[in-house]
Amino acid sequence: MGAQFSKTAAKGEAAAERPGEAAVASSPSKANGQENGHVKVNGDASPAAAEPGAKEELQANGSAPAADKEEPASGGAATPAAADKDEAAAAPEPGAATADKEAAEAEPAEPGSPSAETEGASASSTSSPKAEDGAAPSPSSETPKKKKKRFSFKKSFKLSGFSFKKSKKEAGEGAEAEGATADGAKDEAAAAAGGDAAAAPGEQAGGAGAEGAEGGESREAEAAEPEQPEQPEQPAAEEPRAEEPSEAVGEKAEEPAPGATADDAPSAAGPEQEAPAATDEPAASAAPSASPEPQPECSPEAPPAPVAE
């Protein structure tokens, strides 16, 4: 830039004129809201502000530095005033950029423009998937109903399974109760078997006692028979002899029947009572023996008694 300052005086005059123009251009820009290089929202409506908009478009295309270089070549040597002008022109560019963006956004909003139609088509395309999505939820809304039904079915199945578990528990309790009853029945059967076994030895002992008593009676009868053929004159000698066999028979009856109970005791005492009865019979037979003719005994086995002297 220093080489450009050293050009001809004509160019210097032109540069001198440009600072005045820059001052004139800067004053309305400041009046429109540009202060210290900051642009307000409203931007510049002056023709000087429109030029920076064109420069911004060139910068947007990537040719803004070339335009800056062409201006010093065509306008001659650039002075510090021209540099200030360039800075002032570059400052309102952001405001113009925002205005252009707003205009570009506002243009598609027009209904007759093709861009609006394309946007409408895109909107319809986007809305159609939304509508399809809206239509899709209807099956999805149906499927939740099915799911709800399935869920209720699962609930019923779970409830049925729960009742089945209850039946299993009841069956288990019933099996335990049956096992307990079976055990009780086994215990009762074992107790009954033990009672039968205990009763069987008792019965056997009772039977042995009864047999012993019967044997004792038969032996007493046999002992009474030899007493009868004795002579009737010796009843006193016969009495102690009869008592002795009766005692021996009683002892023998007690020996074969050790398991006899107290009920068998009268049977043991019976022979003792029968023995005196047997002694009374020979005494009665002794009375008729005093007659001259002897009388034979009632028993056929007994031999005839000798004649008394």
From Swiss-Prot:
The modification Phosphoserine is found at residues 26-27, 29, 46, 63, 74, 113, 122, 128, 138, 140-141, 152, 156, 160, 163, 218, 246, 291. Its main location: membrane. A lipid is attached at G2 (N-myristoyl glycine). The modification N6-acetyllysine is found at K165. Keywords: Acetylation, Actin-binding, Calmodulin-binding, Cell membrane, Cytoplasm, Cytoskeleton, Lipoprotein, Membrane, Myristate, Phosphoprotein. The keyword Protease does not apply. Residues 145-157 have a biased composition (Basic residues). Residues 1-309 are annotated as: Disordered. Residues 26-35 have a biased composition (Polar residues). GO terms for biological process: actin crosslink formation; actin filament bundle assembly; actin filament organization; apoptotic process; cell-substrate adhesion; central nervous system development; intracellular protein transport; mitochondrion organization. GO terms for cellular component: actin filament bundle; axon terminus; bleb; cell cortex; centrosome; chromatoid body; cytoplasm; dendritic branch. It is found in: Cell membrane; Cytoplasm, Cytoskeleton; Cytoplasm. It is a lipid-anchor. Residues 238-255 have a biased composition (Basic and acidic residues). Residues 73-82, 89-98, 109-142, 190-203, 271-290 have a biased composition (Low complexity). One of its GO terms (molecular function) is protein kinase C binding. PROSITE patterns: MARCKS_1 (PS00826), MARCKS_2 (PS00827). Residues 145-169 are annotated as: Calmodulin-binding (PSD). Highest levels found in spleen and brain. Intermediate levels seen in thymus, ovary, lung and heart. Very low levels seen in kidney, skeletal muscle and liver. PANTHER family: MYRISTOYLATED ALANINE-RICH C-KINASE SUBSTRATE, MYRISTOYLATED ALANINE-RICH C-KINASE SUBSTRATE MARCKS. Belongs to the MARCKS family. Membrane-associated protein that plays a role in the structural modulation of the actin cytoskeleton, chemotaxis, motility, cell adhesion, phagocytosis, and exocytosis through lipid sequestering and/or protein docking to membranes. Thus, exerts an influence on a plethora of physiological processes, such as embryonic development, tissue regeneration, neuronal plasticity, and inflammation. Sequesters phosphatidylinositol 4,5-bisphosphate (PIP2) at lipid rafts in the plasma membrane of quiescent cells, an action reversed by protein kinase C, ultimately inhibiting exocytosis. This is Myristoylated alanine-rich C-kinase substrate. It comes from Rattus norvegicus (Rat).
